[in-house]
Each structure stands twice: as C-alpha cells, then as structure tokens.
C-alpha cells in the first residue's frame, strides 16, 4: 500500500476492478459533496451497498451510511487491504455490492518508523499562483515497536495531517468591473453608450456585473483533516493475544458551489469528528481450532451549516 501512487487510502478503490469512484465536486450526486460523502460504486451498485470494516468490525456514517469526510484511516495504519466484490460469505451482512476490510498495523519485535511529506510549496517557489493559493501540506508519520521493559507488549502509532488552503481553485478572465461597486448600468444605458462612445469596442467589456471584480486564480473553501491511530498488542502466551486500538479523526471542510461564487462566506461548513475504540481477544485452542472475540465503540459527530457569519454585513 505504501508504494502505490495514492495520497489517500480511499483511492485504493480506484485500483479495483469493476469500481467507479465519483469525484463529488465534479459530477457526483447532488448534495453528496455538501454531506462529505464518498461515492464508490461497484459493478453498477449504489454507494450505500458496500460494507466498510476495520479489523473485521463495521464503520459507517450513522446518518447517511457509507464513508466519506471524517472516515479516513491514514495509510501507515494499514497493513493489508481486503476487497471482496461479490461472492462473499454469509457472515458479512448489510452488503450487496462488496466488502472492504482494512487490517491494521501492529508493533513488531524491532523498532520501526516511517515519514512522508507532500507540499505545494515547490510549485509556489517556481512562481505558480495556483500552488500558492492551494497551500497544500500532507504529513504522514508511523512508528512502533516493543515497549521497554515489557517485551510482550508492542505499540504502533501512526498519524496523518492534511491541509489545503482552497477546496477548489478557478481561473477567471481579466475582464472585471472597473467602476464604483454600486454603479449599475441598465440595458438602455449600455445601448446609449454603444451609440455614443467612440471607444466602445475597447471598453465594452468593462461594463460587466459590479460583483465581477476578480481576475486570475481564486480559491474557494478549504479542507483540513487530521487522523491518528494507536494499537497495543499484548502476547499473553503463545496461544492468547489481546489487542487494544484507538482511532480518531478530526475533519473540517468548506466546499464550494457556484451559487456562492460571489459570497463564499455563505457556503456550508462540515465538521465531522470520528472516534473508535476496539478490543480484540484471540485464543488458539489447538492446531485446528481457534476463536476471536471483538468489541468496538464507533462514534461520529458532525455539524453541517453556516457558522459565525454575518451574511448581509449589517
């Protein structure tokens, strides 16, 4: 997984056969972008027909179902990705299209660490206005190993912090309103100017809407996500193992719609915080028999709306 050309583990679905992952901001289902939902379709099925799991236990948005903003597990926390597009066993309920299961990392007998950083600062340094507005930074870290003085207990910790100064960036033409903001021109005014102004062909494009005052690149919204994962593994005996894991995600996004092209402050914001605690107990009875007990607590809080904004400047 670490060597794949992906920035987010949700892009793993793009690499699977028969899967279409729709970019909500481009051509997705209406309102899915506002809700921060991922659209993953398997062989023509709906996005809500996939069972998403971490270490064999379900995760999903408790209101809309599926996954999306606020349900990101950093890639240094994933040891293996199990994907079953149909034909899965009856043990997997609430799934018609596919089953997705992330097997998480565990600490080993030796200390290990990983670090990765991506940024748009290089493009900005080369003079790219687009990269300057984008202001993209992505940090990935992972480390783990045995806990000192407790050889039977191993720890793994990983985290990812992603920040983008603009959710979407558009390039506008250089035709802007060159007059006072409150000065409007009716169709009759423009017709008179066309007939009387000798320089009409040179200045006619300046008589645009008074709110059209931007030229070049402009960013809208933002997207910030931080998630971290920790896992303790206790090898009680060669036949008994206890695992405790904790996963936390804090996501804050402000998307963009053309309705808010001239008043981005009125666009909805999405706060979505996820917390998952899990306990797993493995007991190997003999060479042919074993059992596993799992319990987890998955909580996802969210706020969608406009906050702390004076929408009419009164």
Named regions from a protein language model:
Residues 117-123, 161-165, 248-252, 297-301:
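Transmembrane beta-strands of outer-membrane beta-barrel pores
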Residues 132-252, 272-286:
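Transmembrane beta-barrel wall of Gram-negative outer-membrane proteins
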Residues 79-88, 96-146, 159, 215-221:
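Short strand-turn segments of transmembrane beta-barrel domains in outer membranes
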Residues 1-90, 94-99, 119-126, 138-140:
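Periplasmic N-terminal accessory/gating domains of Gram-negative outer-membrane beta-barrel systems
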Residues 66, 125-129, 213-218, 261-268, ...:
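Extracellular loop and loop/strand-boundary signature of outer-membrane beta-barrel proteins
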Residues 6, 47, 78, 105-107, ...:
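Outer-membrane beta-barrel channels and translocator barrels
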Residues 111-115, 153-157, 242-244, 291-295:
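Transmembrane beta-strands of outer-membrane beta-barrel proteins
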